[in-house]
Amino acid sequence: MQRLPRTVPLKQAMGMMLTGRRVGAQEGLKLGFVTAMVPHAKLMEEARRWAGLILECSPMSVRATKQAVMRSLDATSLQEAMNNLSYPAYAAMAKGEDAIEGPKAFAEKRKPDWKGR
């Protein structure tokens, strides 16, 4: 309940929450809380595509992003969320081997070899 008004326009969020109205996938896509819509037969293919895209990223970067996003949802304002620098996963990522590997791979025009450390 606390997250929906941060995801979709307030009036739409209130309408859904106060009435319990069900929202279909197409409307969810339009409102922005559905990422993609595919036929049922293509569901696993699309899920694997998304997983592949995520797996191409540094595991430490994915972890830090998830931590920052989830913790920022608890902030009372955008400013508070932006000022909160106490994300342990981000600090670990910034000091890790992958922080060196990413720019190095980019400069060498090759795919990074993420170590997750």
Regions found by a protein language model. Give the residues of each.
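Terminal peptide-recognition signature
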Residues: 4, 28, 65, 106
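Acidic, divalent-metal-coordinating active-site segment for phosphoryl/phosphodiester hydrolysis
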Residues: 20-27
